[in-house]
Amino acid sequence: MKVGLFGANGRMGRVLVEALDLSEDAQLSVATVRDDSPWVGLNVGELAGIGKKDVDCTALSDLSGNDADVMIDFTLPSVIESNLTWCIKNKMPVVIGTTGL
C-alpha cells in the first residue's frame, strides 16, 4: 500500500517515516510539508535521521491525487481543514493523528 504523509517534518511525522521504512506491507510514497517550508525538496529519510530514501519532501500545493492509496495527517489543528478538503476533493482515504482538535 502506498502511504502519503501530511506533516512529514514534525515529531510524529518523522516517527512514521521510520515506521513505514520498516514495514513490509506499506511504503511511504509521498511526504508533504507546508509550501513555504525550508524542508521542501529535502530527502525524507535524511530528515528522519534514517539515511537517504526514495522520497523527498513535497510542497502541499504539488501533491497529486495519484501519489498515495491513503494519507496520514499528523499536522496542526490550524491546517487540518485544508488537508481534509484536499482528501475529499481527491477521494483520498485519510487517517487523522493530529491532536488538539
Regions found by a protein language model. Give the residues of each.
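Short, Asp-centered acidic motifs that coordinate Mg2+ and/or phosphate
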Residues: V30, D69-V70
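Extreme N-terminal starter segment of soluble prokaryotic enzymes
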Residues: M1-G4
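Glycine-rich, highly charged phosphate/nucleotide-binding loops
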Residues: E46-S64, I72-I80
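N-terminal Rossmann NAD(P)H-binding glycine-rich loop of SDR-like oxidoreductase domains
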Residues: F6-N9, G13-E18
